[in-house]
């Protein structure tokens, strides 16, 4: 019976601590015409892990766009301050990305596109604001390096202005 009460108490206390977030990157949606969703789960008060999914909606021939058409990014964040509303973090991520790279045809007779899929390892830094009602705003910037393909871009950007909800 004691074990049952202990298990029930741990379950209730874990639900009382808001430790999950869902977010949408509004900067990507408004500026670059792409959608990025994120989910983040807190391990402790100063560390979390999450996953982001980026889908590029811009056409391939537009000059100002991400190179990647899709990118799935698992990440780990460590928070450096103990302030509950404003917090600074460092992030390590692995970005699995795919897209098309521009290839000039032999003889200069036009341009074609070659598909690629690659994995990037990178770091980012950022800050996060958490309102008492659960609203989340975070801003981050970082860069990763593609490791495997020769047809993929060398560097992968990780930029974002996320708005979301903690529950």
What are these regions, as identified by a protein language model?
Residues 3-14:
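Sec-dependent N-terminal signal peptides
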Residues 4, 18-22, 45-49, 84-90, ...:
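Outer-envelope beta-barrel architecture signal
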Residues 23-36, 60-67, 84, 147-156:
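Solvent-exposed loop/turn segments connecting transmembrane beta-strands
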Residues 24-26, 51-53, 74, 88-94, ...:
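Membrane-embedded beta-strand positions of outer-membrane beta-barrel proteins
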Residues 32-34, 69-73, 118-122, 156-158:
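Transmembrane beta-barrel architecture of outer-membrane proteins
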Residues 41-45, 80-84, 129-133, 167:
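Outer-membrane beta-barrel strand-turn architecture
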Residues 54-69, 96-118, 149-151:
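Flexible, solvent-exposed loop segments that connect beta-strands
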Residues 155-167:
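Outer-membrane beta-barrel "beta-signal"
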